[in-house]
Amino acid sequence: MAFELPKLPYAFDALEPHIDKETMEIHHDKHHNTYVTKLNAVVEGTDLEAKSIEEIVANLDSVPSDIQTAVRNNGGGHLNHSLFWELLTPNSEEKGEVVEKIKEQWGSLDEFKKEFADKAAARFGSGWAWLVVNNGQLEIVTTPNQDNPLTEGKTPILGLDVWEHAYYLKYQNKRPDYISAFWNVVNWEKVDELYNAAK
């Protein structure tokens, strides 16, 4: 069965002024859609068609070598963005078990946000910043390009796209401003749900 572009769970302009409508439209309808189209083209006729995107990305080593890079890039792009849309909301509320766990590990939510923001800003070139569950503990990691922590056996529960296409129309070269705005639209309810499923 072909992979599909998921519908956004909110309107394109719902995250204004933090993430602008035009960026959301291009990011979802063009960038994410291209990953889906290319992924479907590369897995067509292989046994990967029957697998979930999570299963494929978690087991990249078992993907045939001639298509592994294309699957890594486009499969990762599809998985990362599918998760990213769900992790955003116009109604951000900092609550849940995961927030308490963050405070326990980092001392405060602000300390966590600072470390996450620093790592996201320091990610050279294109990539992602993640909060993952690793052996029952929370950890902040970054990945290059469209790599996903699942490939390393870590479960992502919060992710931030730091590719320029995610912010350049509004923030230009000011990635730290985009990262700062991100906290206003984090769907902590979804983060908490993913945390409880992964711990």
Swiss-Prot record:
PANTHER family: 37S RIBOSOMAL PROTEIN S26, MITOCHONDRIAL, SMALL RIBOSOMAL SUBUNIT PROTEIN MS42. Its cofactor is Mn(2+); Fe(3+). Belongs to the iron/manganese superoxide dismutase family. One of its GO terms (cellular component) is cytoplasm. Fe(3+) binds at H27, H81, D161, H165. The keyword Coiled coil does not apply. Its EC number is 1.15.1.1. Coiled coil: none annotated. This is Superoxide dismutase [Mn/Fe]. The keyword Manganese applies. Mn(2+) binds at H27, H81, D161, H165. GO terms for molecular function: metal ion binding; superoxide dismutase activity. Destroys superoxide anion radicals which are normally produced within the cells and which are toxic to biological systems. Catalyzes the dismutation of superoxide anion radicals into O2 and H2O2 by successive reduction and oxidation of the transition metal ion at the active site. Homodimer. Keywords: Iron, Manganese, Metal-binding, Oxidoreductase, Stress response. Binds 1 Mn(2+) or Fe(3+) ion per subunit. The lineage of its organism: Bacteria, Bacillati, Bacillota, Bacilli, Bacillales. It catalyses: 2 superoxide + 2 H(+) = H2O2 + O2. It holds the Pfam family Sod_Fe_N. It is an enzyme of class 1 (oxidoreductase). It comes from Staphylococcus epidermidis.
